Curated annotation (Swiss-Prot):
Protein name according to UniProt: Coiled-coil domain-containing protein 117
Organism: Homo sapiens
Organism lineage string: Eukaryota, Metazoa, Chordata, Craniata, Vertebrata
Described function: Facilitates DNA repair, cell cycle progression, and cell proliferation through its interaction with CIAO2B.
One Gene Ontology term from the biological process aspect of the record: positive regulation of cell population proliferation
InterPro entries, per database record: CCDC117
Keywords, ordered alphabetically: Coiled coil, Cytoplasm, Cytoskeleton, Methylation, Nucleus, Phosphoprotein
Length: 279
């Protein structure tokens, strides 16, 4: 209560009319500058914050908090958005082919690929770029292909060498010699085998070998065997018995038919000629 009796330093205590007078206009004789409307220049209602005052910093803080909340809400909406809507928005945001071509053209000009490209049209630019890329990438591709072919050839050669090294002698064809042949070779009969033929047996090859058998194995004159004599005697006895039986049968058939004697006579001559040929 004591403070109410104290004078306030911010207000004048004099009871003059200066305290109750409205503020003086900026231009004497006019309320507002020329060409300005009073409604536009009228002060807005509400507290006005000075930039250097604490109220201004608080207002800026509220604006930043509001922006953060807005961005956070937009991110949540993007997360809840269905996939189809996202794809549509991405397709809308994607640049068209002309934009891509322009970007490529700018990159080409920036890197200085070919200064004469700038005067060409867009299809001509693309053709020139493709030709330059083919020229730069053609040589490495040839080198890569040549290197691969060389690797394949080296691998095939290595495999062949391994097969030759792993090949065992037991798998090769062998020649079995008899005891007489071995003894003949020990006596160094050049007529039977030569040294070259013996060496060729260790290798898988096809060669013509001429061999002369020993005299004790094959004689010049063949010996007559008794089996052949017995066989010839038995065959002659069989033919004689068949010849005696066959005429008796012909006689039995010829008795009731005397008119057919000429036919049977021809048959007898035929059988006799056959017997002579067999003998």
């Amino acid at each position: 209560m004591a403070a109410l009796g104290r004078p306030f330093s911010g207000l004048p205590l004099s009871g003059g009319s200066d305290f109750l007078q409205p503020p003086q206009p900026a231009f004497p004789g006019r309320a507002f500058p020329p060409g300005a409307d009073g409604a536009e220049l009228a002060p807005r209602p509400g507290p006005r914050a000075v930039p250097s005052s604490p109220a201004g910093s608080a207002a800026r803080g509220r604006v930043s908090v509001h922006c953060k909340k807005k961005h956070k809400r937009e991110e949540e909406e993007d997360d809840d958005c269905p996939v189809r809507k996202k794809r549509i928005t991405e397709a809308e945001l994607c640049a068209g082919p002309n934009d891509w071509i322009l970007c490529a053209h700018q990159d080409v000009e920036g890197h200085g690929v070919n200064p004469s490209v700038s005067g060409l049209s867009i299809p001509g630019i693309l053709d020139v770029i493709c030709e330059e890329m083919d020229q730069t990438t053609g040589e490495p591709q040839c080198e890569v292909a040549r290197r691969k072919l060389q690797e394949i050839e080296d691998r095939i050669i290595d495999e062949d060498e391994e097969v030759e090294a792993d090949r065992n002698v037991n798998h090769l064809p062998s020649l079995v010699l008899s005891d007489t042949m071995k003894t003949g070779l020990k006596r160094e009969f050049d007529e039977v085998f030569t040294k070259k033929m013996i060496e060729s047996m260790s290798r898988p090859s096809m060669e013509l070998v001429l061999w002369k058998p020993l005299p004790e194995l094959l004689s010049d004159k063949p010996k007559p065997s008794s089996n052949t004599k017995n066989y010839t005697g038995e065959s002659q006895a069989k033919h004689v018995a068949a010849g005696t039986a066959f005429p008796q049968r012909t006689e039995l058939f010829s008795e009731p038919r005397p008119t057919g004697m000429s036919l049977y006579n021809s048959l007898e001559t035929a059988t006799s000629t056959e017997e002579e040929m067999e003998l």
